[in-house]
Swiss-Prot record:
Belongs to the EGF domain peptide family. Keywords: Cleavage on pair of basic residues, Disulfide bond, EGF-like domain, Nematocyst, Secreted, Signal, Toxin. The lineage of its organism: Eukaryota, Metazoa, Cnidaria, Anthozoa, Hexacorallia. This is OMEGA-stichotoxin-Shd4a. GO terms for cellular component: extracellular region; nematocyst. Pfam families: EGF (PF00008). It comes from Stichodactyla haddoni (Saddle carpet anemone).
Length: 86
């Protein structure tokens, strides 16, 4: 019986952690999930290549969608690498 209680407690804790992460990063997670479903695009050119991403991020362009996004260095996050992690 103790192992069932331990398992139940672990499941509850895991659900709480996931729920709080989704509440905090839900919108970003949706965007990342959508991006992961698509190809990674190509490296940006022109003005976007040097100015779209902040804090050392790498700009990517998905031509078929007309969208730009950034691959951020480890200590930044956000659509344009504009938010400091942690």
């Amino acid at each position: 019986m103790a192992s069932f209680r331990t398992l139940f407690a672990c499941v509850v804790i895991l659900c709480c952690v996931l729920w709080s992460s989704m509440a905090r990063y839900g919108e970003d997670m949706e965007v990342e999930t959508e991006m992961n479903k698509r190809d990674e695009g190509v490296r940006c050119t022109g003005q976007h290549a040097s100015s779209f991403c902040l804090n050392g991020g790498t700009c990517r362009h998905i031509a078929s969608l007309g969208e730009y996004y950034c691959i951020c260095p480890g200590d930044y996050t956000g659509h344009r690498c504009d938010q400091k992690s942690g």
